[in-house]
Amino acid sequence: MSDASKLDNILAALADPTRRAILLRLSRGDARVTDLAAPFAISLNSVSKHIRILERARLVERRRRGREHVLSRNNHALNEAAAWIETLQAKWHSRIDRLEKALDEEES
């Protein structure tokens, strides 16, 4: 999978408020799938679909503990998205700085 495809998967996964809430919960520590599903007014099957999307984007990792599935957040994928956003932000700041400089020169 290309870096662009990986980033697309990460950003698409982050676009959904339920998936963001799951990641926020996992920021407090590992959790069982059933525990993650509890606060949502949707079926366990729907929560499982959201979790699979997060897994495909490498935002969460699953491991088995007996019969239970335990999830943890993968900060590496979040860091990749943050790095891309920071690069984009730096480019826009540079463009805005050049525009401000050009406007200042016109006023002088």
What are these regions (language model features)?
Residues 51-52:
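Short, hydrophobic-biased segments on the C-terminal half of alpha helices
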Residues 2-45, 68-83:
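N-terminal helix-turn-helix DNA-binding core of bacterial DNA-binding proteins
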Residues 12, 24, 55, 61, ...:
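A cross-family signal for key residues in well-ordered alpha-helices
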